[in-house]
Every structure is written in C-alpha cells, then in structure tokens.
UniProtKB/Swiss-Prot annotation:
A biological process from GO: cellular detoxification of fluoride
Family that this chain belongs to: Belongs to the fluoride channel Fluc/FEX (TC 1.A.43) family.
Subcellular location field: Cell inner membrane
Chain positions recorded as Na(+) binding sites: G75, T78
GO cellular component, one term: plasma membrane
Protein name per its UniProtKB record: Fluoride-specific ion channel FluC
Length: 127
C-alpha cells in the first residue's frame, strides 16, 4: 500500500511541477486563452490515452505504474480547477466569446488528444 501511495505522490508532484512550468512559460503568450493550461490539459489527455491503451494491452504491468502515470502524473498535470477559474475570469472581464472559445478548445482538444493517443498506441501495438 505504501508503494502505491508513493507512486501517486511522486507522479502527482511531478505533474504539478510540469503544469506550473507550462503555465509560467506559455500563459503570458496570449491574453485571452491561457495557453499553459491548455497545453497541460492537451498533453495530459494524450498521455492518459497512451497510458490507458498500454495498460489495457499489457495487463501484466504492475498497477503501481498505472497509478503513477494516470492518477499521479496526469492528475497533477491536468487541471480542471484552474481551467474553470480562468473561464470565470474571462467572463468577469466581459470576454464571453473568449470564455466560450476556451471551453471549446480545452474540452474538444482534450477528448481528441485522448482518442488520438489511444488509437495510435493501439494501432502501433497491433503490428
């Protein structure tokens, strides 16, 4: 149990630091769409897609790795709470169209990245 807890802890900490770095690096690039949060969410969606496809196919892998990557790293990297707050800030500033665009890009982009990663990994491992 302690090993599983440490896997989530290490993955979550690493993902959180990665999200902070992406936010610091990319959020200043655009005033309406927080690109760091978007980048973190899209990368996390892709990683979780690969992870889920990998763990579905490789059932012998220690569950600790699934916890480290999906629950830990992706949980720390992706952030619905920050995304939600950024949408609220855009709405408070009266930038309704940008808020709606931010919602659409984050939601559709995350779904697309997860599906793409799952499909790519499944196709590659079938050969």
């Amino acid at each position: 149990m302690l090993q599983l807890l440490l896997a989530v802890f290490i993955g979550g900490g690493t993902g959180s630091v990665a999200r902070w770095f992406l936010s610091m690096r990319f959020n200043p690039m655009h005033q309406a769409i927080p690109l760091g949060t978007l980048t973190a969410n899209l990368i996390g969606a892709f990683i979780i897609g690969v992870g889920l496809a990998w763990f579905n196919r490789m059932t012998h892998i220690d569950p600790m790795w699934k916890l480290l990557i999906t629950t830990g790293f992706c949980g720390g990297l992706t952030t619905f709470s920050t995304f939600s707050a950024e949408v609220v800030f855009l709405l408070q500033d009266g930038r309704i169209n940008w808020a709606l665009a931010n919602i659409a890009v984050n939601m559709l982009g995350s779904f697309a990245m997860t599906a793409l990663a799952f499909w790519l990994f499944s196709a590659a491992s079938a050969h």
